Amino acid sequence: MAAPMELFCWSGGWGLPSVDLDSLAVLTYARFTGAPLKVHKISNPWRSPSGTLPALRTSHGEVISVPHKIITHLRKEKYNADYDLSARQGADTLAFMSLLEEKLLPVLVHTFWIDTKNYVEVTRKWYAEAMPFPLNFFLPGRMQRQYMERLELLSGEHMPEDEEELEKELYREARECLTLLSQRLGSQKFFFGDAPASLDAFVFSYLALLLQAKLPSGKLQAHLRGLHNLCAYCTHILSLYFPWDGAEVPPPRQTPAGPETEEEPYRRRNQILSVLAGLAAMVGYALLSGIVSIQRATPARAPGTRALGMAEEDEEE
């Protein structure tokens, strides 16, 4: 019997099953199609088989880490949300996907990762609280730098140098995109009628993040809340496909009293290695930046093993 497919994705918050755009899109598509996945909602990307999130481990052991490729694999496994679409609807899907990536993705990156107030009070706060020590000290900042580079690539050569002008242009195009989506959806349940398709999975992931996060600087959020059919669309998908999801940072898993399970030694090993890697990174940074210098002195006793007592919490659901 083949092993089950396993999906590794960022854990949930803000009333959503995942706070990450790509993870949310893949999760939603899987729910739409009823794909039998063993889902691991985690807050440590190092525990993913690819080192990134989301990632799919197939029944044959192959690891796929690009959202579109994950969905393509699910289609090959006969979990195809677009099976009943016409050729024209397929073309519309491609057109709207391009529109989302060109007009809405840049402003989503700006809203959560570039806007200082939102980043400090919402984005960094969530990741710092959800991630295990010591990743929470440096990984959110590294992710922010990666998203800054991503925004530059998305904006291309036409990216205004003036920050205020860039923000004005991004939000203007995003508002136009949302209005167009609202007009296209109309009074339908989904974009192509009564059944969800892959386009719905991606549109929902964009809209739900904007709607659900409590943003102190929510310019686009205010515009979206004025488009009542899009708000009802997100509420409908959440209640129908994720009725039990969307909790805040999951509590640590309770370890049952009694004999050690078969996986326990490996879990402890991974916890210790994770802590050692994090400590090594922090010490290396301190030495390179000059925060700490090494001087000759009388050798001191090495710290005992109790220093390794803090290990990451198991965020898996």
UniProtKB/Swiss-Prot annotation:
Alphabetical GO biological process terms: mitochondrion organization; protein transport
Pfam families: GST_C_6 (PF17171), Tom37 (PF10568)
Record flagged with keyword Transport: yes
PTM text: Ubiquitinated by PRKN during mitophagy, leading to its degradation and enhancement of mitophagy. Deubiquitinated by USP30.
Glycyl lysine isopeptide (Lys-Gly) (interchain with G-Cter in ubiquitin) crosslink residues: 38, 41, 78
Transmembrane segments: 164-184
Location(s), subcellular: Mitochondrion outer membrane
GO cellular component, one term: SAM complex
Keywords on record: Isopeptide bond, Membrane, Mitochondrion, Mitochondrion outer membrane, Protein transport, Transmembrane, Transmembrane helix, Transport, Ubl conjugation
SUPFAM superfamilies from the UniProt entry: GST C-terminal domain-like
Family: Belongs to the metaxin family.
Functional description taken from the UniProt entry: Involved in transport of proteins into the mitochondrion. Essential for embryonic development.
Quaternary state and interactors: Interacts with MTX2/metaxin-2. Associates with the mitochondrial contact site and cristae organizing system (MICOS) complex, composed of at least MICOS10/MIC10, CHCHD3/MIC19, CHCHD6/MIC25, APOOL/MIC27, IMMT/MIC60, APOO/MIC23/MIC26 and QIL1/MIC13. This complex was also known under the names MINOS or MitOS complex. The MICOS complex associates with mitochondrial outer membrane proteins SAMM50, MTX1 and MTX2 (together described as components of the mitochondrial outer membrane sorting assembly machinery (SAM) complex) and DNAJC11, mitochondrial inner membrane protein TMEM11 and with HSPA9.
Protein name: Metaxin-1
Organism field: Macaca fascicularis (Crab-eating macaque)
